[in-house]
Regions:
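A structural boundary/capping signal
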Residues: 1-140
Length: 140
């Protein structure tokens, strides 16, 4: 079973944030697309005990990834009032948004593309986002 160190989880969160930030001007937040794609890529790399969580941020639904150790929240930066919070925190520490629901992780690239497609205007934008995530997210 593969585990992520804090450094590796932070690096992956930063890389995911970088990709998502390039797409945020399209409208709604990219917490769900970023979280589902990151979780799928982590699972493909052999990281176990991953789940996508969602809860209310006070401004609508908010999505993040949880491993057995870390809460990885790569799209916090899209909210100016949350910029000071770290993108990765231990799941044992209070302070994150409470999870209202846990979601299944896409089992294939096709499922990942389908799952995140609602966050984009068309299939080409969806495909571009997933390709950028695949290129950015590399586990060492």
């Amino acid at each position: 079973m593969r585990k992520l160190s804090l450094q590796e989880a932070t690096r992956l969160a930063e890389q995911t944030a970088g990709v998502a930030e390039g797409h945020i001007p399209y409208g709604s937040g990219l917490g769900a697309p970023a979280s589902f794609t990151l979780a799928w890529l982590l699972q493909e790399a052999g990281v176990e005990e991953i789940r996508v969580a969602s809860g209310s941020s006070g401004m609508g639904d908010h999505f993040w990834v949880e491993t057995d150790q870390w809460r990885i929240d790569p799209t916090l930066r899209q909210f100016a009032h949350l910029n000071s919070r770290p993108l990765v925190e231990p799941v044992s520490e209070p302070g994150g948004f409470p999870a209202d629901k846990y979601h299944a992780i896409p089992r294939s690239r096709q499922e990942a593309v389908r799952e995140v497609s609602y966050g984009f205007r068309n299939a080409a934008e969806t495909e571009q986002f997933v390709r950028e995530m695949e290129a950015a997210i590399r586990l060492q």
